[in-house]
């Protein structure tokens, strides 16, 4: 399926200092991977679960 363009963005932790475990879609490996999110800002390539990431962006 056509994945949204934000799936191609690099994970962005944003400007806050939280340490939230989130998932992002990695275009090169075609996998949903973990990164740590600060809690504000960032971009749309940021999911709470791997399933949500896979449903939106595809990948493994």
UniProtKB/Swiss-Prot annotation:
One of its GO terms (cellular component) is extracellular space. One of its GO terms (molecular function) is serine-type endopeptidase inhibitor activity. It is found in: Secreted. Residues 7-57 form the BPTI/Kunitz inhibitor domain. It comes from the Eukaryota. Disulfide bonds join 7-57, 16-40, 32-53. The record marks 17-18 as: Reactive bond for trypsin. Keywords: Disulfide bond, Protease inhibitor, Secreted, Serine protease inhibitor. Signal peptide: none annotated. Coiled coil: none annotated. InterPro entries: Kunitz_BPTI, Kunitz_BPTI_sf, Prtase_inh_Kunz-CS, TFPI/VKTCI-like. Expressed by the venom gland. Transmembrane segments: none annotated. Belongs to the venom Kunitz-type family. Serine protease inhibitor. This is Kunitz-type serine protease inhibitor 2. It comes from Daboia siamensis (Eastern Russel's viper).
């Amino acid at each position: 399926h056509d994945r949204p363009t934000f799936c191609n963005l690099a994970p962005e932790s944003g400007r806050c200092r939280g340490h939230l475990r989130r998932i992002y879609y990695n275009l090169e490996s075609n996998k949903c991977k973990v990164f740590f999110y600060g809690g504000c800002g960032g971009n749309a390539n940021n999911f709470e679960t791997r399933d949500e990431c896979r449903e939106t962006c595809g990948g493994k």
